[in-house]
Amino acid sequence: INKINLNTQNFFLINADWLSCFKNDSFDLILSNPPYISQNDLHLKDLTHEPKIALASNESGYSDIKKITQQSSKILKRRGILMIEHGYNQEKVVKSIFKDNYFSDICTIEDYQAHPRVTYGILNK
């Protein structure tokens, strides 16, 4: 692992079910790039440099996004911000997931090809 190879001391690794290891009301901002490709996506066979687990998620690519959003609504401080990268065709569903988990002021940022790529919202509970 690069942490060992580079003798890096300024970060640590945590093995957890996404955000489950953190206390409630711990963060002002969470930024995530979770797996968001459907397990059945034909493009996965062409991606040889990344492990499938880093790219693909169950429930048509939404399983990890749902879990992170649900957990974020507990560990973010009030008015905290959640930002999640997602597929270009997932904006509508991701916004719905945010709304279902007490996020408001939900917006999406486009990538350099003008595709919806990152959705963010403010925790409002």
Give names to the regions the model predicted.
Residues I1-N124:
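S-adenosylmethionine
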